[in-house]
């Protein structure tokens, strides 16, 4: 994953070669305009920024889109690695929590966070990355975010436990809508027509994905148990001649058994008492709704906190995982059953090694996703990365059908995935157009400021003043 013998995270030395005689010439010290808030918004929302140089990620890790090489064969490696890492992470998590009666989700997250901290610490000790040292002030400022992240990953694992991967992936898009309108209310963001159109497609795909459960609600509500004649009420009938009892034949027994099974299955998934039989209120959808709310809250809070702390990518990952360990440990002891019987139920002897290995591997996958994300942006561009993220939702959703055969391949499931995939493409296109418009506006204002400062004195160099900074 590195190029030659040089690590991706190692800073590269930048030299400026001056032409002969350049020392006697007046240098052009025009300073480019500072990035606007819209330019920095993608990074603050958890996505990539368009241009960023930092010793922690390599001096030339992330360059301007105009300096990026054209997407070709060399860019396939980071793109494929990013897609493979995200798909693997989802599939392994689904395998881990989908066991019969599994209820130790917080313990799984505790192990994953410990593995993540260990991997980052090893990379820092090996000199691959640089981390900010632990201090009480940063820990105190970041603790609310770590607690919120615990709820994000906990509710996400519970939703993934009860829902199939396709429905989970489709409903995860609704988080984007909450974040967008949260930015409108608190950060002065705006939603363009193209982005709004993508939101409508996201909602439509979610309705299609949940249509089977919605239909089940009306079907169960209209169920009526066939009447059983009094003569065979107890399952026995009496011979009118001898008076002897014999097993009665009920011609509606098959239909009754099917109705009872449907009612029992729907009631078993209810999380709210008093709504037995209504599959729409199953715990999977409740956990998914909570996950969307927690995820949006986490992203919006991080946008404020990251300005206060000045964290970089690896600092954020390290603090998130490190500070979440005591929170996960406390919540696991308070909420989950740590008895020997329950631990043996969740980690049976015949699957114990496989489950623990999968949990450790999924913790390492989180690090791999962060690395491949930066690699993909470095090798291509932030625009290409956003499109890859939208395209990647299709194989992630299809992975549930391939590995777990859930949901079955039906017109409804395929339509939901297709509409959700199209919604992601429209959203990525709309955000890219919005970013381009913001860049054009920034360049126009920069050129205007340069011409105004240069018009004061024809012999002076056009420069921006410090008051021109937007940050």
Swiss-Prot record:
Residues 1-52, 442-471 are annotated as: Disordered. Residues 92-101, 161-166, 215-279, 337-354, 405-408 are lumenal. The chain crosses the membrane at residues 71-91, 102-122, 140-160, 167-187, 194-214, 280-300, 316-336, 355-375, 384-404, 409-429. Glycans are attached at residues 164, 222. Residues 442-460 have a biased composition (Low complexity). Coiled coil: none annotated. It is a multi-pass membrane protein. It is found in: Golgi apparatus membrane; Cytoplasmic vesicle membrane; Endoplasmic reticulum membrane. Residues 1-70, 123-139, 188-193, 301-315, 376-383, 430-471 are cytoplasmic. Involved in the import of GDP-mannose from the cytoplasm into the Golgi lumen. Belongs to the TPT transporter family. SLC35D subfamily. Homooligomer. This is GDP-mannose transporter. The gene is VRG4.
């Amino acid at each position: 994953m590195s190029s030659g013998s040089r690590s991706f995270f190692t800073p590269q030395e930048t030299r400026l070669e001056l032409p002969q005689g350049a020392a006697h010439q007046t240098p052009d010290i025009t300073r480019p305009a500072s990035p606007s808030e819209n330019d920095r918004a993608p990074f603050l929302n958890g996505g990539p920024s368009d241009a960023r140089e930092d010793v922690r990620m390599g001096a030339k890790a992330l360059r301007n889109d105009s300096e990026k090489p054209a997407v070709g064969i060399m860019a396939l490696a980071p793109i494929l690695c990013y897609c493979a890492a995200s798909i693997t992470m989802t599939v392994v998590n689904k395998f881990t929590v989908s066991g019969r009666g599994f209820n130790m989700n917080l313990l799984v997250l505790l192990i994953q966070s410990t593995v993540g901290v260990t991997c980052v610490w090893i990379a820092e000790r090996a000199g691959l990355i640089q981390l900010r040292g632990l201090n009480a002030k940063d820990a105190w400022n970041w603790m609310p975010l770590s607690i919120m992240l615990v709820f994000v990953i906990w509710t996400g694992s519970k939703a993934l436990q009860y829902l199939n991967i396709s429905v989970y992936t489709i409903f995860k898009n609704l988080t984007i809508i909450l974040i967008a309108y949260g930015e409108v209310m608190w950060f002065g963001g705006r939603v363009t027509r193209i982005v709004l159109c993508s939101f409508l497609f996201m909602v439509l795909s979610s309705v299609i994905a949940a249509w089977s459960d919605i239909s089940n609600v009306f079907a169960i509500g209209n169920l009526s148990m066939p009447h059983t004649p009094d003569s065979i009420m107890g399952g026995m009938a009496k011979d009118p001649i001898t008076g002897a009892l014999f097993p009665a034949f009920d011609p509606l027994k098959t239909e009754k058994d099917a109705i009872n099974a449907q009612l029992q299955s729907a009631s078993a998934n209810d999380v709210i008492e008093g709504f037995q039989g209504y599959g729409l209120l199953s715990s999977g959808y409740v956990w998914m709704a909570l996950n969307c709310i927690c995820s949006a809250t986490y992203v919006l809070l991080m946008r404020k906190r990251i300005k206060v702390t000045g964290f970089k990518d690896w600092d954020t990952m390290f603090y998130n995982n490190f500070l979440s360990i005591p929170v996960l440990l406390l919540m696991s002891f308070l909420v989950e059953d740590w008895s020997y019987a329950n631990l043996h139920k969740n980690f049976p002897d015949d699957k114990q090694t496989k489950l623990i290995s999968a949990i450790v591997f999924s913790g390492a996958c989180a690090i791999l996703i962060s690395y491949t994300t930066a690699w993909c942006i470095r090798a291509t561009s932030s625009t290409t990365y956003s499109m890859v993220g939208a395209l990647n939702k299709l194989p992630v959703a299809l992975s549930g059908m391939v590995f777990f055969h859930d949901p079955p391949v039906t017109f409804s499931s395929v339509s939901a995935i297709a509409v959700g995939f199209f919604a992601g493409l429209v959203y990525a296109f709309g955000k890219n157009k919005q970013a381009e418009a913001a860049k054009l506006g920034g360049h126009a204002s920069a050129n205007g400021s340069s011409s105004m400062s240069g018009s004061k004195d024809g012999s002076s160099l056009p420069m921006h003043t410090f008051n021109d900074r937007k940050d």
